[in-house]
Amino acid sequence: MSASRSRNKQSKLCDDERLDISKDEFNRFQEAFGQEEFRKLFFDYVDEIQDPENRKIYEAEITQLEKERGVEVRFIHPKPGFVIKTALDGELKCFINIASSEEIERPKNEVATDPSSGSRGLNWSIPMAQTTSRDDFDAKNNHCKVFDVVFHPDALHLAMRNKQFRQCLIDTALDAVEREYKVSLDRANLKFPKLDYKGIPRPTVIRKMSDNPTAEEQEPHPLAHMFPTKPPAPGKPEPRVLPMKTKPTPVPEFTVPRYTIKHSHDVDLSEYTDELDAKLHVTVPRSLVVEIELPLLRSTAECQLDVTSKSVYLFSERQGAKYRLKLDLPFIVDDKAGRARFDTDMRRLSITLPVVRKSVQEQAQMHETLRHFSREDSGVELHSNSESPVEEDPDGELSDSKADISKTSSPTVVRNANSPFLKSSVHYQLPSKFDCNVLDNVMAFVLHVPNVQPDSIEQLREQRSLHLKFATIGSGYYPTHYAFYVELSADHEDSAIESAEAEAWDNNVVLKLYLNSQSETPAGYLAGLDATELKEYPVHGQYHVKSKEKVNAKKENAPLDVEFERNQEGHALKVTIRPGTKEEEEEEEDKENQDQKPESDQQQQQQVQNKKSGKKQRKRNKKERSLSESACADMVLQEPLAKSNELQPRATFKLPPQRKQRSYSESNDSTGRSHRGILKRFSRYGPRPSMSDSCSSIDDSSSYSCSVDASGASLFSQSFGGIPEEDRSDAGLSESCKKTVRFNDHIMKQVFRLDSSILGQRKKNQKRRDLKLRAQQRRLSEGDSVDYEETRGSALKQKENPSRNCTDSGLDLTGAAGAHSNNNESDAKNAMMFEMDD
């Protein structure tokens, strides 16, 4: 922008046309001026032009030529008067020559009355003429501009005698230059050097139509009367009269110099990345460059400069160069690290001031704010009324979660009760939706307000009430202020608030009020914008954390239900041992309470018990499963017995609490069977016991029984250390072997980062599984093909005699030969992979 302004300035001030010369012409001039004869002829030509007698002959010829064309020409030769020195557009030095000539008309005056004041005075009409501007040089060979304004000699004579007329003559000359050349002159710093005329006087020409037309003009033109024309007005044309200003323009005592402010910025490659804060400081420059044009000053010793963090002040009292500038800067600058330089050739003062940027802490906080606003929504809806299994969480995990939340929660500002909490100049509003849940002596409020600034949370806590306020930032970066006042109900006078915590999340604000130990569980509370606008609200949910000791004691004291059933057809004995369920406990409690209730209540309870007993019997029928005699090694039948549909009666009795046990078949080898089941592999190098699926269907015509296979008792105890081995000598217990699955009470939990989404985490886990599977496939290289064939051969041999390694489990395996072959091949591959790992 500065370069274009300088080009416009040069085009405005330099009116002379540029010399357009080719290289050939330049070489010819160079060769000609190298000859002495040509130089002599050239100097004679210059002397002839500058000779006054020759100038008169030239002017007479031009006058005669123009007269033949019907134009009257007058040459004006300016005579020296006095010179005015000032600045042009605040950048360039200029001179205005006040000259005189007899060809200009005399000034005229007439008596006039001022309409505003009614005073009588003289109304002057001062004719003048102007010449074209020209470039020149001052005493120090610096570029300057020269203008000529020519008056009648009588006007200069009156100016020398009357001070007011002199000032009127100066104002007329300045107005003429500004109006004609569209420039601005510095009227506050006018100087009058001891010069009569600046430069060499150059005549100018005044042309006007002649009063006596020539003979050629008197002859009618053949095309002149084709169209009607307007007749000329009678009388002589009057010259143009420029009205003078009725009120003089007030001249300021000091001039405001011309200045420019440039924003300097370095090229930083970090701004061209895709980071959130890459373009955070693009609009903030590294430094500010202030350039002040002082064309009337020779050095900075003649002015005073004061720079602060937000402004620049320049002051000069030198006669003829009075400047005063007070400039406000757009950014905060470091005034101690700035530097200034004055260009004596251009008369320009340049001040470079580095811009103060934000500290590292503020930039980090701003980065976190941007990351918070640009975080993707996880897509999980939060339901405040959804009940969570609080009773199942142990005390240890609950205390750990409280400790983690207290560490991660942002600190809130606690205000003094004496100062007004809510500002009168800010409009606060109550959250449109909020919920309350009670967990023992903790009241948890969920205020559904998204995008809450953690730093804006402030609270004012009293004994039975709490006042909370916070602010949010919307999509247009416009803050919205909220306030929430909660007070305990008057029904519970012993309740008091010991402490409070407020934490801002993505979609809501969680407020926790910790009550004292003597307080009862509140059923409601009072809430509103402040203490004057309160409304009673009920508590949505009340939860109590059960003690871990009570839960364990109840589990240990739970009775066991043992049932026996004999089958005469297959000589099988079915033993079912299960702990007492919650339904049975409820039945026992109902029986105890029936003695204290009236007869009508007992009838209703009897109907409920009948329904529950029916459901319990259906569940038992679904879960009960019998095992054949081949499932136990100590029972072998030689002759089949006669079929009978009658069953022995079942007996149900209570046993003392004992740990469940499992039996496994010794005749089955783990290497000959495929490991399919719901239990995972325990070790890559140790034995791998297999368990058949507990949920598989059992066919009556199958010749195999479901069992737990292992290679030996010692190997089985390594993998299933938590399940004790059964006593094989006890035939009753061996017949009661039942396949069960035990689950751990420990609940696994997964913690996700705040800035990650569920879809992104799922993609990451899928990629990890693909890489793991690809790595396992690469392990099967060509060099291990021999081991693979040997292992495959041993597996095929075991396939030929399946009856030797398999026992009757009650499943139909005759139609699954293809599946066995595939399983054996997979076992061979796994065995080979384990050998490679060794």
Curated annotation (Swiss-Prot):
Residues 106-125, 212-238, 370-411, 557-696, 776-838 are annotated as: Disordered. The modification Phosphoserine is found at S378, S781. Residues 370-380, 557-572, 789-802 have a biased composition (Basic and acidic residues). Residues 114-125 have a biased composition (Polar residues). Keywords: Cytoplasm, Phosphoprotein. PANTHER family: PIH1 DOMAIN-CONTAINING PROTEIN 1, PROTEIN KINTOUN. Required for cytoplasmic pre-assembly of axonemal dyneins, thereby playing a central role in motility in cilia and flagella. Involved in pre-assembly of dynein arm complexes in the cytoplasm before intraflagellar transport loads them for the ciliary compartment. This is Protein kintoun. The lineage of its organism: Eukaryota, Metazoa, Ecdysozoa, Arthropoda, Hexapoda. The gene is Nop17l.
